[in-house]
Regions:
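Short beta-strand element of the alpha/beta-hydrolase
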Residues: 68-77
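The serine-hydrolase catalytic nucleophile loop
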Residues: 78-90
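Glycine-rich "HGGG/HGxG" loop immediately N-terminal to the catalytic nucleophile
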Residues: 83-84, 106-120, 182
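Conserved alpha/beta-hydrolase
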Residues: 93-112
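Conserved acidic catalytic loop of the alpha/beta-hydrolase fold
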Residues: 124-144
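Short glycine-enriched nucleophile-adjacent loop
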Residues: 154-165
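A catalytic-pocket lid/entrance helix-loop region that shapes and gates access to the active site
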Residues: 163-216
Length: 217
């Protein structure tokens, strides 16, 4: 019994040391990241909740100079928040722009189980996008801003810029989405082909049951 007790105590001691090491390493890493990405005097770094489309949605604003041009970055998905990567992504661009990351409705910090499911539709996302654009223009007293979108976000950004060209200095698309239905069809055909090649009958039958896009909502 004494031997077993000693083994357990030894394991507990090792685990305790490992936990201390993990937490200490994280604290050191966090402080290093904060030092490397801290905004200088005259800059801005702010995580905020704003009301968009009648619900609370979150934005992260970062830039080395408050009077630099405003750049709204729209993530992909829908639902694929990229705010957690912002400090790594924006290392250089925050020197020349005030970058605004936005967690769209239902994504990241903007998630809530109380958001009506019917509001998850294209026009609502587009409405949210333009409402945020208007909010940023008013807050920073700008006539125009820059808008950049990735994947699904490139669609929202492109359509918003097309509908309201006078509100933007420029539009930038990353992994530009051009035809959503065609995009889903190509993905479906690829998945079906892979399931057949890999002899994955379950996946193959599931895909056949789902059917080819466009999907009914």
């Amino acid at each position: 019994m004494k031997t077993v007790k000693k083994i357990f105590l030894g394991i507990a001691a090792v685990l305790a040391v490992l936990l201390v090491y993990v937490f200490a390493s994280k604290a050191i890493t966090d402080r290093k990241m904060e030092r490397e990405t801290a905004m200088p005097e005259g800059g801005i770094s702010s995580l905020e909740s704003v009301t968009i489309g009648g619900i609370s949605q979150w934005i992260l604003i970062r830039g080395e100079k408050k009077d630099n041009p405003i750049l709204l970055y729209i993530h992909g998905g829908p639902g694929s928040t990229e705010m957690f990567m912002s400090r790594k992504m924006d290392t250089e661009i925050v020197k020349d722009f005030v970058v605004v990351h936005w967690d769209q409705r239902g994504a990241g910090k903007s998630y809530s189980p109380f958001i009506p499911s019917a509001s998850y539709n294209r026009e609502q996302y587009l409405s949210d996008t333009y409402e945020l654009v208007s909010l940023l223009k008013k807050r920073f007293s700008r006539n125009k801003i820059y808008i950049m979108g990735h994947s699904w976000g490139s669609y929202l950004a492109a359509v918003t810029a097309h509908r309201h060209p006078d509100d933007f200095c420029a539009f930038v698309g990353i992994g530009q989405m051009v035809n959503a239905v065609e995009n889903e069809s190509v993905s479906y055909d690829f998945a079906l082909k892979r399931a057949l090649i890999e002899e994955n009958k379950e996946a193959f039958n599931d895909l056949l049951e789902i059917g080819k896009p466009p999907y009914k909502t």
